[in-house]
């Protein structure tokens, strides 16, 4: 289905919906709890978030075609994927997150989004929203057109591996 949320929702309504979807989700706390148990030594797992307004502006600068595929590598609770879905017209929106608890939060948000969009009578489908629980280094992203990675805390080794992976992207 190619009826994009952007066609039905104003920017202010999209932001309002986004804020309500994330009102009870604390990605920082989820990440902190997970890192204490599993990843405490690796600083590459430090969680960070994006702002709706600024990320929307960044995406608009990319000028994606409607057949473009958007990836977020290290998608956390899925914020960039949800913002992209609400404000842009991509063919697919794919988030890849290694931390299970963050991934589960993203799935929960997608389910809440489905419920919120029911009032449009099935005209807006979240079928193109895909969340994968895995290391992005183990996923084939070569079909991606726009790749986002909030990599400010990625260590040198991870950045080198990511650079090699990005070289496989279509041009």
Predicted region positions:
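Conserved short alpha-helix immediately C-terminal to the canonical SAM/SAH-binding motif I
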Residues: 80, 101-105
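Conserved class I S-adenosyl-L-methionine
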Residues: 67-76
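A short SAM/SAH-binding and catalytic strip from SAM-dependent methyltransferases
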Residues: 145-157
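S-adenosyl-L-methionine
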Residues: 1-66, 104-141
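A short, conserved alpha-helix within the catalytic core of class I
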Residues: 154-166
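Conserved SAM-binding loop of SAM-dependent methyltransferases across substrates and taxa
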Residues: 79-90
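Conserved SAM-binding motif I beta-strand of class I
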Residues: 92-97
């Amino acid at each position: 289905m190619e009826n994009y949320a952007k066609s039905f929702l104003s920017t202010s309504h999209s932001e309002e919906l986004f804020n309500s979807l994330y009102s009870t989700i604390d990605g920082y706390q989820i990440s902190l709890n997970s890192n204490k148990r599993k990843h405490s030594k690796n600083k590459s797992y430090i969680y960070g978030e994006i702002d709706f307004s600024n990320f929307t502006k960044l995406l608009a600068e990319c000028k994606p075609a409607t057949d473009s595929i958007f990836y977020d590598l290290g998608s956390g609770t899925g914020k960039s994927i949800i913002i992209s879905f609400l404000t842009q017209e991509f063919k697919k929106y794919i988030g890849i997150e290694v931390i299970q608890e963050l991934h589960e939060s993203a799935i929960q948000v997608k389910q809440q989004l489905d419920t919120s969009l029911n009032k449009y009578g099935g005209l807006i489908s979240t079928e193109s929203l895909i969340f994968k629980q895995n290391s992005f280094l183990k996923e084939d992203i070569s079909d991606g057109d726009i790749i986002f990675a909030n990599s400010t805390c990625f260590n040198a080794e991870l950045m080198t591996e990511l650079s090699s992976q990005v070289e496989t992207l279509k041009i």
